[in-house]
Amino acid sequence: MARLAAFDMDGTLLMPDHRLGDKTLSTLKRLHDRDITLTFATGRHVLEMRHLLGALSLDAFLITGNGTRIHSVEGEVLHRQDLDPDVADLVLHSTWETEASIHVFNDTGWLTGKEIPELLHAHVYSGFRYQLTDLRRIPAHSVTKICFCGDHDDLCRLRIQLNDALGNRAHLTFSAMDCLEVLPVGCNKGSALAVLSDHLGLTLQDCMAFGDAMNDREMLGSVGRGLIMGNAMPQLIAELSHLPVIGHCRNEAVSHFLTHWLDQPNLPYSPE
């Protein structure tokens, strides 16, 4: 029996309209009642996640910024990791051959240089939004992560440029087909979940986790039971081909799987 359950948000726990379904919320509360610790492992900012948890009346640990921060249920910072200032400075002050927009995250929030209203659709239920600023004036010593948003093929070409410039000084990952992230070295949801597990006196084998994108790869591959969404990025399914694939987030597949796991644990599971 898993003792810790970790959930990606967008494309996994949330439906395509970025809303948490009623069945999913009910199932999460059933897990809590079974003394299974909940953690949400997401690229979203902790300020946004705190608002969402408060609105849903859920108690959970938070792994935010794709592993750059871990917070306890009470809001205490358990772990923090920032980009190397030299890396942040290089990424923010270099000229890259890309049409992608650039976004900076630090403890104050989400910062970008121009209005991009379509990016706010994913945050409509929380009301979280970017702050407009001159990105070149942001202090490099306080950056948690930098994201590029745009066309996937363009981002793939950008990844080559970034990799050539940064080498092993940063971790690059796709959190969605249209979002490439620059993270601190060794920083990912899997490494953060290992820190949290140790804090709770557990091991990763005591965990189950759900995800859909390449930023979930380390987490899904390291836990006792990793489950991939049916709507996952093809690259993730290919790299973790040994893991089971459940249903689509639009059908609240996480809730469907967990209801079966709670009620009929000895019977084979089918996502249909």
From Swiss-Prot:
Active-site annotation: D8 (nucleophile)
Function in brief: Catalyzes the hydrolysis of 4-amino-2-methyl-5-hydroxymethylpyrimidine pyrophosphate (HMP-PP) to 4-amino-2-methyl-5-hydroxymethylpyrimidine phosphate (HMP-P).
Gene3D superfamilies named among the record's database cross-references: 3.30.1240.10, HAD superfamily/HAD-like (3.40.50.1000)
Family the UniProt entry places it in: Belongs to the HAD-like hydrolase superfamily. Cof family.
Gene: cof
Keywords associated with the record: Hydrolase, Magnesium, Metal-binding
Catalytic activity: 4-amino-2-methyl-5-(diphosphooxymethyl)pyrimidine + H2O = 4-amino-2-methyl-5-(phosphooxymethyl)pyrimidine + phosphate + H(+)
PANTHER family cross-referenced by the UniProt entry: HMP-PP PHOSPHATASE, PTHR47267
Single GO term (MF): 4-amino-5-hydroxymethyl-2-methylpyrimidine diphosphatase activity
Top EC class for this record: hydrolase
Pfam families: Hydrolase_3
UniProt protein name: HMP-PP phosphatase
Residues the record lists as binding Mg(2+): D8, D10, D212
CDD domains: HAD_Pase
Species assigned in the record: Enterobacter sp. (strain 638)
Enzyme Commission no: 3.6.1.-
Cofactor: Mg(2+)
Lineage, highest ranks first: Bacteria, Pseudomonadati, Pseudomonadota, Gammaproteobacteria, Enterobacterales
